Amino acid sequence: MMNMQNMMKQAQKLQKQMEQKQADLAAMQFTGKSAQELVTATFTGDKQLVSIDFKEAVVDPEDIETLQDMTAQAINAALAQIDEATKKTLGAFAGKLPF
């Protein structure tokens, strides 16, 4: 019975640590950039959009498609950074689970 209690205590401790890491990650900001950094997108670690910024050179009413493509590049780059940080931050817990 003692072994089960120790496992539960360890699991609760790991859960608190993981929740703190998730909160830390959510408080961070990640910025993705398009080619030539003409579009930047900034997200929080919990994938909430903070801002999208456009350089004047990319705003051309005759070429909306380029603006759309660069916006998608910037957003995807930021989201990839978040995914990588999440793997690094929370992936460490996978090997520590007591069961």
From Swiss-Prot:
Keywords assigned by UniProt, alphabetized: Cytoplasm, DNA-binding
Q: Which GO terms describe its molecular function?
A: DNA binding
Q: Signal peptide position in this chain?
A: none
InterPro entries with a match to the protein in the record: YbaB-like_sf, YbaB/EbfC
Where does this one sit in the cell? Answer: Cytoplasm, Nucleoid
Q: Which Gene3D superfamilies match?
A: Nucleoid-associated protein YbaB-like domain
What cellular-component terms does GO give this entry? bacterial nucleoid; cytosol
Subunit description: Homodimer.
Role according to the record: Binds to DNA and alters its conformation. May be involved in regulation of gene expression, nucleoid organization and DNA protection.
Q: Which family does it belong to?
A: Belongs to the YbaB/EbfC family.
* Protein name, as recorded: Nucleoid-associated protein Sez_0297
